[in-house]
Amino acid sequence: MTVKTRFAPSPTGYLHIGGVRTALFSWAFARHHKGEFLLRIEDTDLARSTAESVNIILDGMKWVGLNYDNADNVVYQTRRFDRYKEVIAELLEKGHAYYCYCSKEELEAMREKAEKEGSATYDRRWRPEVGKTLPEIPSDVQPVVRFKTPLDGVTKWTDLVKGEISIPNEALDDLIIARADGTPTYNFCVVVDDYDMGVTHVIRGDDHVNNTPKQINILKAIDANLPEYGHLPMILNEQGKKISKRSGDTVAITDFGAMGILPEAMLNYLARLGWAHGDDEFFTMEQFIEWFDLKDVSPSPSRMDLKKLYWINGEHIKITPNGKLAELVKPRLALRDIHETEKPALEDVLELVKDRPQDLNTLADECFYFYVKQTPAEADVQKHWDDEAAARMLRFAERLEGLEDWNAEAIHDLFKPFCDEEGIKMGKLGMPLRLAVCGTAKTPSVDAVLALIGKEEVLKRIRA
């Protein structure tokens, strides 16, 4: 059997990080088992689904690098209405579905009664049964189509995350599978799609647990093989509450990109939300695919920790090739009006500075002063700069100007003799020198920084 999983987002807004985590686990499960990972766009909500939102999903999947095997044949539910109608007709013909002519007023009365009695909402008055007389068909009501849910027994499955789950069928409604206008409903479309796509494992959020028995019963009615189900725990915010944009939480995957998070780091972090492989925190996607098993997914909710995300991002920045980092940093430098990054070469700059920043925006800040001197912070000026420091910088510039070989080692060899002559410690030279050349007191080794910036530019900045 070829394992087939799917990710099935609705294009009604941004691509949520919870959705990306679901896609990641589905993708990793398929890749681990040498199977297929498929994408389906559930766009039957015509009022809310937009082409822009579809593009947001596709762009988000591309950004994080979750490649799907049906890229040339993505399934769109709105293109499958004829297929849904065909299956509904089959269910009606075989007696697994029926027309319901209840008015809105009747349904509202049933709903109120059900809330009081704790029973299923619909009283099945239009459900055909042996010896039962159905009401007279009203002339002013367009019928919906309802599925005939079994009245006895239980619907159960062994959830790949939550374990054994059993739901009494008497607790289930005869759900609507086609609205009065003929459009199919969510739970029905999902079943037909999973069946036609050959999905073997449905991995999704645990907010879908209640949909599962309904979908299993429909699958049985169409004589389909049942997929296995795994329901993933919710992701909570740092306060332990449901993630919400309204609460100020970052929820859209594209927002994390704007924050300077690498896609590899984002996936690494999301993988650790609810899944664990020993104490491993930092790993590649190749390792994740090798290690991933749904039995290692906790059924308990996970909590966001932005500090941990940034730490993981910093670790990924360290191992990212400088050429790739340069392409990511250049647009951020361009926003600061830095368009020429040849002198010094940006890749050389990144090699020097990339061990400290934990996001690409901060990394760009670290590169900035190699091309343009920053305006020093007032606190740094107060602490490290005065008239004597200014005079000392001019004297040290003369030593620098006398160097024939301009490299970090030659520059470093000037420090101790100069400090001895001046009767100062290295801090009295190094910190003002950083301010004079870079405009900041926080840089990597100052000799390496000066070597990269170049002799002419260093002398120009000191003497400015």
Curated annotation (Swiss-Prot):
Disulfide topology: none
GO cellular component, one term: cytosol
Protein's UniProt keywords contain Nucleotide-binding: yes
Range of residues in the leader sequence: none
Catalyzed reactions: tRNA(Glu) + L-glutamate + ATP = L-glutamyl-tRNA(Glu) + AMP + diphosphate
Annotated residues for binding of ATP: 245
InterPro entries linked: aa-tRNA-synth_I_cd-bd, aa-tRNA-synth_I_codon-bd_sub2, aa-tRNA-synth_I_CS, aa_tRNA-synth_I_cd-bd_sf, Glu-tRNA-ligase_bac/mito, Glu/Gln-tRNA-synth, Glu/Gln-tRNA-synth_Ib_cat-dom, GluQ/Sye
Positions of short motif 'HIGH' region: 9-19
Assembly mode: Monomer.
Function: Catalyzes the attachment of glutamate to tRNA(Glu) in a two-step reaction: glutamate is first activated by ATP to form Glu-AMP and then transferred to the acceptor end of tRNA(Glu).
Name of the protein in question: Glutamate--tRNA ligase
Gene source species: Neisseria meningitidis serogroup B (strain ATCC BAA-335 / MC58)
Gene this chain is encoded by: gltX
